[in-house]
Design a protein with these regions (language model features):
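Hydrophobic alpha-helical segments and their helix-loop boundaries in membrane
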Residues: 1-256
Length: 256
């Protein structure tokens, strides 16, 4: 009986660490953290992935109620959250780009309630949905889980992990929030700016025409038309953002 209890305690102490890292990743990654993936599904997925990775390596037995155990809890949460945050940058870039497009079209007040992001413009929500479909089409969910499981070999549990290079990489990659949003929105914003300038010139030349009465619906229609015409290039840019995110995730793990 005592031998059985000792084996159960040892199993708990070894399974705890990979499960903490996997759970932290699932809570912060863009696809697995959405409201459609319920807490039960996330817990079940975390347990399943933990059992998958358990036979692949020799796990250290660390008591979580010691100083070393508390440090290890912090490190596993840090690694899981960091890997999820690297992917979350892509969705943040899409929201920034969607907000810029909505403001140019005059739809900045047309918001939707997103359970993960709060109030976001409808254009941004549309881009996030497209991004999720592209992510699944690229097989990103499989690649991300593979990288997560590989992280246990590259960033082993029980060893000291240098946090500074990982934080610097995250800060460097977070610049893509604004750069990626600008790459997505700039063609449409430039076209709408030219239309706005044209309307302003017409209004200045003939004030009696009252161009602003039709200017607002015209800007919305032009914005929708430009968005539809730009969807192929936007799709390629979203695909490029995901591919860059996978590369950065590999750099964080030391693969690239």
């Amino acid at each position: 009986m005592e031998l059985l209890v000792a084996e159960v305690v040892k199993l708990f102490y070894t399974l705890l660490w990979p499960m903490i890292r996997i759970s932290a990743f699932l809570l912060t990654s863009p696809f697995f953290s959405i409201q459609a993936v319920t807490v039960r599904i996330r817990v079940l997925l975390a347990v399943l992935l933990t059992w998958m990775v358990y036979p692949l390596t020799n796990w250290p037995v660390i008591d979580p109620f010691t100083a070393m155990g508390l440090r290890e809890i912090f490190m596993q949460v840090f690694v899981g959250v960091l890997l999820g945050t690297l992917l979350q940058v892509v969705n943040s870039a899409l929201i920034v780009g969607g907000q810029a497009i909505s403001a140019s079209m005059g739809l900045s007040m047309a918001n939707m309630v997103d359970p993960n992001m709060g109030n976001v413009p409808v254009i941004a929500q549309f881009l996030v949905i497209c991004s999720t479909l592209i992510f699944l089409g690229l097989g990103g969910h499989v690649l991300v889980i593979s990288l997560l499981l590989e992280s246990f070999n590259l960033l082993p549990i029980g060893e000291i992990i240098e946090a500074k290079p990982l934080l610097l990489l995250t800060i460097e990659w977070s610049a893509m929030i604004f750069l990626g949003g600008l790459l997505l929105a700039l063609p449409i914003m430039t076209s709408l700016l030219l239309i706005n300038i044209g309307l302003g010139v017409i209004t200045r030349a003939a004030p009696a025409l009252n161009i602003f009465a039709v200017g607002f619906p015209a800007m919305i229609m032009a914005g929708m038309l430009l968005l539809a015409m730009s969807m192929s290039s936007i799709g390629f840019r979203i695909q490029w953002l995901w591919q860059e995110a996978f590369k950065v995730m590999g750099r964080a793990l030391g693969i690239v």
